[in-house]
């Protein structure tokens, strides 16, 4: 317990001094910085080599703290009670007097917010006097990090501190909803949209190709292994890594499995780490 509190204090110290810290979430690891500080947020973009017009998700401890920066609507309250903290992000109207850095929102009047579930990250947020902007801890357009070693592989010693929370349980990014008007889906992710529709008692509008870029994950190239991929392949070529959802009996070293029993949640959890392993094993193609 003492070591956990010591690690949280260390992460807090770096964040308080406008440095970036890698943090664990239930989805993927995040690259966190004080969302109220222009200089801190700019470091996120610099480290990730991220375009400034790609907005960031801001993480809050609870809805009470969110009220300082955002207008709260009925749809948010319904979804918050059911799914937050958890793998869902909401795009909301930003208050005029909000302290959120203009670099977080790309000068827009809206903001993407989330309440993470990971206990270690929540403990950190509870002890901060500000929310944190925290996109995925990877170089832009590359594979997201799901464990501390992935973060080190991406950034080396450029990050001041990694708050080690083990491997991410979900392994893919959060589902993003636009709640500015009629609820619409901006990005598929860790929360099933059918569950969301059941709570709202209405169908979501699908707006995953939105040109407004109200949230992350809407650019053409995202979360890429940087290797050519062929789909619906029955037999791979000798120089290809063969990526399968369900495990098959094979002694070939180019077979990679996302799940033992074709479980979609297990497959999602293992996707990024398996793609990263394929790349690190030296394969130049995936089937």
Q: Language-model features: where?
A:
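Active-site-adjacent structural elements in enzyme catalytic cores
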Residues: 1-287
């Amino acid at each position: 317990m003492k070591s956990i509190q010591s690690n949280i204090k260390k992460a807090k110290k770096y964040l308080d001094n406008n440095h970036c810290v890698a943090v664990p979430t239930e989805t993927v690891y995040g690259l966190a910085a004080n969302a109220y500080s222009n200089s801190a947020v700019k470091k996120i973009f610099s480290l990730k080599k991220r375009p400034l017009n790609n907005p960031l998700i801001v993480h809050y401890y609870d809805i009470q703290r969110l009220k300082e920066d955002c207008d709260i609507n009925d749809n948010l309250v319904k979804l918050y009670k059911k799914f937050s903290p958890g793998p869902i992000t909401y795009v909301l109207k930003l208050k005029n007097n909000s302290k959120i850095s203009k670099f977080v929102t790309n000068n827009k009047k809206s903001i993407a917010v989330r309440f993470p579930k990971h206990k270690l990250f929540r403990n950190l947020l509870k002890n901060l006097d500000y929310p944190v902007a925290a996109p995925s801890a990877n170089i832009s357009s590359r594979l997201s990090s799901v464990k501390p070693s992935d973060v080190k592989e991406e950034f080396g010693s450029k990050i001041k501190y990694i708050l080690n929370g083990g491997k991410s349980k979900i392994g893919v990014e959060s589902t993003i909803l636009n709640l500015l008007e009629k609820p619409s889906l901006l990005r598929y992710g860790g929360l099933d949209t059918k569950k969301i529709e059941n709570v709202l008692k209405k169908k979501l509008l699908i707006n995953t190709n939105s040109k407004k870029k109200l949230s992350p994950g809407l650019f053409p190239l995202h979360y890429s292994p940087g290797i050519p991929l062929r789909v619906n392949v029955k037999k791979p070529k000798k120089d290809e890594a063969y990526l399968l959802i369900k495990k098959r009996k094979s002694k070939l070293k180019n077979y990679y499995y996302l799940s033992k029993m074709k479980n979609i949640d297990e497959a999602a959890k293992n996707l990024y780490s398996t793609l990263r392993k394929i790349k690190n094993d030296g394969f130049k193609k995936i089937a």
